[in-house]
Amino acid sequence: MRLCDRDIEAWLDSGKLGIEPRPPVERINGATVDVRLGNQFRVFRGHTAAFIDLSGPKDEVSAALERVMSDEINLPEGEAFFLHPGELALAVTLESVTIPDDLVGWLDGRSSLARLGLMVHVTAHRIDPGWQGRIVLEFYNSGKLPLALRPGMLIGALSFEPLSGPAARPYNSRQDAKYRGQQGAVASRIDKD
């Protein structure tokens, strides 16, 4: 059962759930909290690798990732990031989220943006118990026109679901947590699997 708006506010008030900066009550709706787009992005460099062998030797996977991913792009205030049709890019939420060990979060895109072809997450929409950091967004433009994305715009909504008990291995306490405490548009770390 997902938390309703009153419960989300109570969890925020108690400090069990953290969202910084804290959203105003107008962005806590029914069963979700609206999140905004941050100013950090990463894109794929075109045609710098023939392919990435996802199950190949770790050093080869790492080298291929280095070739295809850009450095982090930090947009100055007021500028737009343009996502062209058929392009995949990484971005990050403006908000940093701290989820307790007995809660799981879910990220959903906004219907208004989806109707224009924008996918906010390709597949990874679960936010694990024990998570702490900003949420990386996997943008894909499946529409026909370039989309101008501006930092600060509403980009998605988080919902939260209590677990049957505290997780025995919450994300941030695991030694193998590849994205622990991320604050930027962190590229894939599949080579760390």
UniProtKB/Swiss-Prot annotation:
Superkingdom of this protein's organism: Bacteria
Keyword Nucleotide-binding (UniProt): yes
GO terms under biological process: dUMP biosynthetic process; dUTP biosynthetic process; nucleobase-containing small molecule interconversion
Pathway(s) annotated for this protein in UniProt: Pyrimidine metabolism; dUMP biosynthesis; dUMP from dCTP (dUTP route): step 1/2
Intrachain disulfide bonds: none
GO molecular function per UniProt: dCTP deaminase activity; nucleotide binding
EC number: 3.5.4.13
Reaction catalyzed: dCTP + H2O + H(+) = dUTP + NH4(+)
Alphabetic keyword roster: Hydrolase, Nucleotide metabolism, Nucleotide-binding
Pfam family, one: DCD
Region Disordered: start-end pairs: 169-193
Annotated CDD domains: trimeric_dUTPase (cd07557)
Keyword Cytoplasm: no
Active site: E138 (proton donor/acceptor)
Binding site for dCTP: R110, S111, S112, L113, A114, R115, D128, V136, L137, E138, Y171, K178, Q182
InterPro entries per the UniProt record, alphabetical: dCTP_deaminase, dUTPase-like_sf, dUTPase_trimeric
Gene3D superfamilies in the record: 2.70.40.10
Transmembrane segments: none
Biological role: Catalyzes the deamination of dCTP to dUTP.
Similarity comment: Belongs to the dCTP deaminase family.
Subunit structure and binding partners: Homotrimer.
Protein name: dCTP deaminase
